[in-house]
């Protein structure tokens, strides 16, 4: 093939890096866990032991035990302090003051007055107490006792009582004899109450038997001439477009 077919300086060459349009699947979008290191290692792969170099441990400077911090005097033995007793000079303590009992002159019998002698009662005028107006004790008028007059008392015997009403027209001198009730005025009891009751029937609307109310297709609703599935049929072809292999799927959310 000569170089006359190519126009310009562009020539077919291998791409330097992967082109996303070459892949129909997300492909490199998913980051698989690595097989090296300790962090984010693939759990389905064997992981070799990993070692790290750290700094040197510091030696504890502060000792928790008292150690030689105690200053034991030289005259202290297992039985106590050894040596002669030592004394120190200190001031004299103060004497405790004695209780001063009151004498006869401390009392004033003349001031006893009402406490030691009989005296007449004395009264003083003061203002009215505040609790007097808020006394909630009910008085005699607060109780609603039932009346003892009339026949409404169940535990008391009541005398006969009478009431006055108007004069009845029945049997009086001005009774209208033309208003005698006729046969239609009386309410006749149904004989079926106290005699043998015959059967009773009522007429109602015709009941429709339950069934399927959907519309069933008739013979004219079918088109047997349009059925081609039961007959031999030639293959059918359709014209479509050719999809490019460089069309990449739409990736909206891409993790950084």
From Swiss-Prot:
Q: What is its main location?
A: cytoplasm
Which spans of this chain does UniProt mark as STPGR repeats?
A: 66-92, 181-206, 217-242
Family per similarity comment? Belongs to the CIMAP family.
Further notes on this entry?
Answer: 'Shippo' is a Japanese word for tail.
State its location(s): Cytoplasm; Cytoplasm, Cytoskeleton, Flagellum axoneme
Give the taxonomic lineage as stored in the record: Eukaryota, Metazoa, Chordata, Craniata, Vertebrata
Name-wise, this protein is Ciliary microtubule associated protein 1A
What role is this protein assigned? Outer dense fibers are filamentous structures located on the outside of the axoneme in the midpiece and principal piece of the mammalian sperm tail. May help to maintain the passive elastic structures and elastic recoil of the sperm tail.
Recorded hits in InterPro entries, A to Z, give:
CIMAP, SHIPPO-rpt
Region of interest: Disordered: 91-115
Q: One GO cellular component from the entry?
A: cytoplasm
The keyword Metal-binding is annotated on this UniProt entry: no
The record's section on PANTHER family has: BOREALIN N-TERMINAL DOMAIN-CONTAINING PROTEIN-RELATED (PTHR21580:SF28), SHIPPO-1-RELATED (PTHR21580)
**What keywords does the record list, in alphabetical order?**
Cell projection, Cilium, Cytoplasm, Cytoskeleton, Flagellum, Repeat
